[in-house]
Structures are given as C-alpha cells and as structure tokens.
C-alpha cells in the first residue's frame, strides 16, 4: 500500500497547500472557477466526491422561523460563524457582500468556530440561534433541525500529471466504484449522482 498522511483543513487552506506543494491532493467544496483561481498556473484534475446541501442548523421546531440568509440581518438572530476559508464562511460572506449587508450588523459574526460539529453544538447549547453547515452535523446532534439552502459539490483536487501515478489512478478507481457510492449513500445528506465525474482545469 501507499502511506497516506491526512490533515484536516478548510477548502481555502487545502487548495493553498496544494498550490505550494505541501499536499498532493486537496479536498474542497468550492466551484470550479474558484478552484482555478486559487491554484493558478497549474493543470488540475478535479474529481467530484459527492454533492450535499448547505443550510441552517436551528433548534428543533425552528422557533425563530429562520428560512433564508436575509434573516441574519435581524437583531434577534445570533449566528455561530465559521473560520475564514471554510465553505460556510465563504458562502455567507458572498451573500452579505452581494446583498450589501454589513457583517457588523450580523449578531455573532465575529464568533469563529472551526467545524460544523462545533457550530451545531453552539446552536444545540443555545449559545447561538443558528449556524451554516452540512446536514450531517444537525443529524448527529439529535437536537436540531436542518433548513437546506443550496446544493454544493465536494471535490478532490490534484495536479493532472499525478493521475498517471498508480496511487492516484487507484484513488479515481475507488471513487468511481459501487462500493464507494454505497458507503456515501449511507451517510446523511450525500448525493452520489455526480460521484466520480472528472474535470480538467
């Protein structure tokens, strides 16, 4: 077998590590244009792992009726935010900029946590009214509802020349296997319709 060292990073930092050759493969939940811009001057191969819904974690019953990002500008809504470079943070910041909403007007915006599990826990423990993230964290909590907003892709990103190497070619074969799809389908919120699709950037 081939030894694999894994490091948990957000999408931005994963691509940064790939660009500076500190990693051979990055896992990123950004669109293809973002990936291209963050790793310039490099031929890339991008494999779709799965698609998932990003949405709100809310207490059971959604007592404050949070159904859209516009709700975050309300003074009675406090958010548990993610760190810069994470997909939920990028998603939120783009919305705020596009809607001309000042981050300073969003209660809790400066509270940065480093995982979906931690933001979901903040909502479950009544330290925040809501947070953005993947459905699985709400499901694991058992105390939260999930309000989906949009479907996003999760990609594996590598330099194109790596695909000619046995370990990387084997990885693509695994991702395209029925066994891998079956495992993903057993996880909450993962859509395998596009699993195994390969893109060249």
Regions from the PLM with identified roles:
Residues 7-16, 104-121:
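Short helix-initiation/N-cap motifs at beta->coil->alpha
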Residues 27-39, 120-150:
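A ligand-binding cleft/hinge motif common to bilobed small-molecule-binding domains
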Residues 76-96, 178-201:
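Ligand-binding clefts/hinges and TM-proximal coupling segments of bilobed small-molecule sensing domains
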